[in-house]
Swiss-Prot record:
Catalysed reactions, semicolon-separated: betaine aldehyde + NAD(+) + H2O = glycine betaine + NADH + 2 H(+)
Record protein name field: Betaine aldehyde dehydrogenase
Cofactor note (record): Binds 2 potassium ions per subunit.
CDD domains: ALDH_F9_TMBADH
Assigned protein family: Belongs to the aldehyde dehydrogenase family.
GO terms of biological process kind: glycine betaine biosynthetic process from choline
Length: 489
């Protein structure tokens, strides 16, 4: 028996059975307990979801922007009312501590929907005068049916981030959550339906990458929004272009630099470094895993980091006191342990952690100790490649120019941060760093108002902020002639 039983697809405002006859299992990463059997969508199911979305989108787009805004605000209220219930499911599915999911995942997802509900009525065109008797006006119109493909680290938050601007602009969305954490997207679908979103406007199809490929290549989908790894992102972009030249926005991986200058408040810098590496057990795309510390303060900074690592409370995610849980899956655990072994083999100095935790109840879960390496070099695998786990690499530097060059020496460009009391140096450095999301004397917050996305191979386009509405609308230009028409022939 599983905890949540059989999970079906959500199409046309209701749960429906998949036609594939296939299911997959999802497990609690803290205990290994079977959470649910989940039905896998077939190609026919994807077609059914897209057709339902087309029908629902026409009804949704015909509403006024104010009507759509009111419905989305009702969804926000329902999300907040069900916060504790949804957080409990998210904790079981992802392994995140309950204190984290209660305070962050649903809360921030609801905030983004509320933000775009407020902007729905502000989507407008321009009027461009040409001459006394002629002008042009533009309309921002919805794209139609969009596809959202989510990652496993923030399941419901990502679903909210993708649906909020899409629905606010009058689109429909077919969403595929990660097969590793598939549960809460279905709850969001229930909430949208209860709030009054027309049937078909938000459909959920479950499955592995083959289902994502069906969505990406579907000729009746106008846009794909993807969150995940770089290599998968490249496949998404290629298939989207080859199928129908559909628009793509992607938030991909990172190997982000955190730069600590010698005038930094060391307590603040250590606090930032620890949260930038160990929040959500290090499974955050924007993690600042390359910690560059000016040489004169490296020892003092490292000591403060290690003090804080000792205070991390690793435990059962369902315990209120826990602030560090397991990794999301056995596969992710093996990957992280492989990186740790690589760091040791390449000569990095292990300062903390570096092992799987197996004592007591830890033996049933995918736990790895918070890990800190010192004496790291830029050419090490743990410094070059995204780990997506709780592994911090500390590197030292001498000069501002040196650290900027080294920080930019990567094909990633998602995030970056600077800790310094010198405001001029902070801005000067940030302006030279090749990253789309940057923080000065803080780390990690991504409010609804803030556009987020990467440079280089860390992504295309943005999520959140006003600019994201541009990715979910298309411009129609209309010329109006009020005067006499002058024929050419």
């Amino acid at each position: 028996m599983s905890v949540y039983g059989l999970q079906r697809l959500y199409i046309g405002g209701a749960y429906v059975d998949a036609t594939s006859g296939k299911t997959f299992d999802t497990f609690d990463p803290a205990t290994g307990e079977l959470l649910a059997q989940v039905q896998q969508a077939s190609a026919a199911d994807v077609d059914r979801a897209v057709a339902s979305a087309q029908q629902g989108q026409r009804e949704w787009a015909a509403l006024t922007a104010m009507q759509r805004s009111r419905i989305l605000r009702r969804a926000v209220d329902l999300l907040r009312e069900r916060n504790d219930e949804l957080a409990a499911i998210e904790t079981r599915d992802t392994g995140k501590p309950i204190g984290e999911t209660l305070a962050v995942d649903i809360v921030t997802g609801a905030d983004v929907i509320e933000y775009y509900a407020g902007l729905a009525t502000a989507i407008e065109g321009l009027q461009v005068p040409l001459r006394a008797e002629s002008f042009v006006y533009t309309r921002r119109e919805p794209l139609g049916v969009c596809a959202g493909i989510g990652a496993w680290n923030y399941p419901i938050q990502i679903a909210c981030w993708k649906t909020a601007p899409a629905l606010a602009a009058g689109n429909a969305m077919v969403f595929k959550p990660s097969e590793v954490t598939p549960l809460t997207a279905l709850k969001l679908a229930e909430i949208y339906t209860e709030a009054g979103v027309p049937a078909g406007v938000f459909n959920v199809v479950q499955g592995d990458g083959s289902v994502g490929a069906l969505l990406t290549g579907h000729p009746d989908i106008a846009k794909v929004s993807f969150t995940g790894g770089v290599e998968t992102g490249k496949k998404v972009m290629s298939l989207a272009g080859a199928s129908s030249l559909k628009e793509v926005t992607m938030e991909l991986g990172g190997k982000s630099p955190l730069i600590v200058f010698d005038d930094a408040d060391l307590d603040r810098a250590a606090d930032i470094a620890v949260i930038a590496n160990f929040f959500s057990s290090g499974q955050v795309c924007t993690n600042g895993t390359r910690v560059f510390v000016q040489r004169s303060i490296k020892d003092a900074f490292t000591a403060k980091v290690l003090e804080r690592v000792k205070r991390i409370r690793v435990g059962k995610p369902t315990d209120a006191d826990t602030n560090f849980g397991p990794l999301v899956s056995a596969a992710q655990l093996d990957k992280v342990l492989g990186f740790i072994a690589s760091g040791k083999a390449e000569g990095a100095k292990l300062l903390a952690g570096g092992t799987r935790l197996t004592d007591g109840h830890f033996a049933d879960g995918q736990y790895v100790a918070p890990t800190v390496f010192g004496d790291c070099r830029d050419d090490m695998k743990i410094v070059r490649e995204e780990i997506f786990g709780p592994v911090m690499s500390i590197l030292d530097f001498e000069s501002e120019d040196e650290v900027i060059a080294r920080a930019n020496d990567t094909h990633y460009g998602l995030a970056a941060g600077v800790v310094t009391e010198n405001l001029s140096r902070a801005h000067r450095t940030i302006h030279r760093l090749e990253a789309g999301i940057c923080w000065i004397n803080t780390w990690g917050e991504s409010p609804a108002e803030m556009p987020v996305g990467g440079y280089k191979q860390s992504g295309v386009g943005r999520e959140n902020g006003i600019t994201t509405l541009e990715h979910y609308t298309r411009i129609k230009s209309v010329q109006v002639e009020l005067g006499r028409y002058n024929p050419v022939f």
